[in-house]
């Protein structure tokens, strides 16, 4: 007897590019099973840098200004509670300093088989920086010998390197990671930044995350890349990591980076680098001021779209 497909709920949020990370954070506070993002800023970047892409989805060209975020939920008794929370949180984004854009939230049903297969169309091989290529494990890619390939199964809830914050962090890792370096990746998510550091010949990499789902995802991705110089830990940096490193990378949010700037020094060797992103432009000065107040020297500030990456050193 054929197994009957279950229905899922596809929740669609139309917002601004600036609010993508904030809306994603709202969704992660619920029992979301997957997220797909169509961002006009990403499409604009792809069009300008089309030569860096193995694949460019022409069907995304007509995305309106802003972003469309699709989240997937099991159809169960808890969904209406999540929906109310999401609607209220999106409505309140402007009180937190975000442009919510249209701020429209809608829902529809989607068949399980369609959901499981169709989300993968959003992820194609992507060149990031000088030589790193992020390749979903199900995609074929004719690699160049000079390129560094990162095999990734992002699942539905983690980034694949196309977002500006991830891209700027990887570009910074390419610039600053040296052989024999030890690198700590805070809030590792899919493990993409830690894996990039390991592939760039860091001697040792430790990735940490408070989310058990992220830890499991990162460990699987480390396995796909056959790396033995990277360890993924569950917990808080201050509690689970011992020793010092040459580079700390954190792609989180401005508030957490400001908090880290006060304590992260104890984990850095003299002359070490703190690479931070997930910072919206409106919070740039706060982050920079906090780093300076806590003894860091600003090496460089990168900006792409609405986002900022700050590289600081001791």
UniProtKB/Swiss-Prot annotation:
Enzyme class: transferase
Any one Pfam family match given in the protein's UniProt record, by short name: PrmA
Main location class: cytoplasm
Sequence positions that bind S-adenosyl-L-methionine: 166, 187, 209, 251
Catalysis: reaction(s): L-lysyl-[protein] + 3 S-adenosyl-L-methionine = N(6),N(6),N(6)-trimethyl-L-lysyl-[protein] + 3 S-adenosyl-L-homocysteine + 3 H(+)
UniProt GO molecular function: protein-lysine N-methyltransferase activity
The protein's name in its UniProt record: Ribosomal protein L11 methyltransferase
């Amino acid at each position: 007897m054929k197994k009957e497909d279950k229905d899922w709920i596809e929740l669609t949020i139309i917002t601004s590019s600036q609010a993508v990370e904030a809306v994603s954070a709202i969704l992660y506070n619920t029992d979301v099973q997957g997220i797909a993002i169509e961002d006009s800023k990403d499409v604009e970047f792809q069009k300008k840098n089309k030569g860096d892409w193995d694949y460019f989805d022409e069907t995304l060209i007509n995305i309106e200004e802003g972003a469309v975020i699709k989240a997937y939920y099991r159809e169960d008794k808890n969904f209406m509670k999540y929906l109310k929370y999401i609607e209220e949180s999106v409505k309140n984004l402007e009180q937190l300093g975000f442009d919510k854009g249209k701020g429209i939230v809608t829902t529809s049903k989607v068949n399980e088989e369609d959901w499981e297969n169709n989300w993968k169309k959003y992820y194609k091989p992507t060149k990031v920086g000088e030589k790193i290529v992020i390749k979903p494990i199900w995609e074929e890619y004719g690699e160049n010998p000079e390129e560094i390939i990162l095999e990734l199964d992002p699942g539905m809830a983690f980034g694949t390197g196309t977002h500006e914050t991830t891209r700027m962090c990887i570009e910074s890792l390419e610039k600053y990671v040296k052989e024999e370096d030890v690198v700590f990746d805070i809030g590792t998510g899919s493990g993409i930044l830690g894996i990039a550091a390991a592939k760039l010949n860091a001697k040792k990499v430790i990735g940490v995350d408070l989310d058990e789902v992220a830890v499991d995802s990162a460990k699987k991705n480390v396995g796909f890349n056959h790396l033995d110089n990277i360890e993924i830990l569950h917990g808080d940096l201050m509690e689970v990591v011992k020793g010092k490193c040459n580079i700390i990378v954190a792609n989180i949010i401005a508030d957490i980076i400001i908090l880290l700037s006060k304590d992260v020094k104890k984990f850095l060797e003299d002359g070490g680098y703190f690479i931070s992103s997930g910072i919206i432009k409106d919070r740039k000065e706060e982050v920079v001021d906090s780093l300076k107040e806590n003894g860091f020297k600003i090496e460089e500030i990168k900006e792409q779209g609405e986002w900022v990456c700050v590289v600081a050193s001791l």
